[in-house]
Amino acid sequence: MSESQPMMDIASPGSTGKEKKTPKAKENKEKKTTTPKEPKVTKTKEPKQPKEPKQTKEPKQPKQSKESKEPKVSKEKKTPATPKEPKDQKDTKEQKPKKLTKKQLAAQQSVTTVAPPLGTPPPPTTATTTTTTATTSTSSTSTSNSQPSTPSILDLPSPSQSTKKQRISTPSTASANKKPTVNKTSKKIEQSEDDESADNDDDEDEDDDDDDNNSKNKKKNNNNNNDEEDEDEDEDEESESDSDFEKSNRKRKKIFQKNKNRGRLQSDDDDEDGSGSGSDEDSDEDSDDSDSDESDSDDSDSDSDSDSDSDSDSDSSEGEGNDDDDDESTFNLSEMQVRENTQMNTLIKHFSEDQQTRFEYYKRSSFQRANIKKVMQSVLSAPVNQTSAIVMGGIAKVFVGEIVELARSIMEEWRETGPIRPRHIREAYRRLKESNSIPYYKKSVPKSMK
């Protein structure tokens, strides 16, 4: 710690406590000498030699035809088998005999060969050896079973016969343990019988199949017949329902035509009663109104008819009475409308040009619904419905029209010319009040307005 550190010069104004770094002279780096690259030697490409054409393949030589084979030597024909006896045709309806199993058949036709002991009686004379044919064996077995021959003492077996196999009717206990030897003929018989039984079974199975097919066909035919009958019944029911529907339509058409004829007669009578005056447009409107009324009445009649058909007899009679009342009421309304229309036509016919123009303006004029709604709400102090405002607008239109017409008549009475004055309107309003023809929203007019 003996070394002293240099003190910083505080008096120097530009000293910041850090010594300025002296720029180090960069050593000139030695430039690397780059050795020039040797120019690449361009290789001269040798032209490729054309390939030699491939040798064409020689056509294959046709194969040598194989030596004709030697004809086969025809084998010796087998001796024709003995024809089988014709089968007895069995009735299909006869009961089937109980079939015997193969074991039972083998037990019946088996031949047990045992050397008889000395002193035993010889076998029955009808027994045959193993070389006998099928027919002789069957006949011998049947005769031996049916008529057994009685043994005799004199018929003793010779030494040559004792070595042969003989048939014994009842085998002894020693022979019971030995296996029975079956002859070839017995095997053939068994096979033939099995074949016959199999053929019979096949025939019976075919007969059963035929019976089943016949029964199935009968069932199908019956089902088809039943289906056809059901379809016929459905068609009959549909035709009946169609006929009922047509009848009801005819009734409705008749009622509609009757009502039309009534309306036409009534309109003709009304036209005759009137002066016969009126424009073509008004007559068309009258006919349209009458037709609409008649159509409404026809609709009500048709509805009432459909209701009366569904109800009982008493209800139908009451419904007919109600329908008559409805017809009378609609008839009265149509009469009133026709009279009013005829009166209007007569008045319009006598209008002057000025009156016709004023009438057209009157028809096309209307009050604003918003203004009428405000007036009604201020009077009633309650919200007003849109429909009520429309109705009140129509009433106001009629009321104002009456006042204007009355004021014009008053102006003519006073023999004044010019437009309508307020005094004319006041006089008209006074006269309407006296006649109690001022519209009001209540039934009775208040005393203040009288």
Curated annotation (Swiss-Prot):
Pfam families: TAFII28. Residues 192-212, 226-243, 268-329 have a biased composition (Acidic residues). Residues 1-329 are annotated as: Disordered. The keyword Nucleus applies. SUPFAM superfamilies: Histone-fold. GO terms for cellular component: transcription factor TFIID complex. Belongs to the TAF11 family. This is Transcription initiation factor TFIID subunit 11. It comes from Dictyostelium discoideum (Social amoeba). The lineage of its organism: Eukaryota, Amoebozoa, Evosea, Eumycetozoa, Dictyostelia. The gene is taf11.
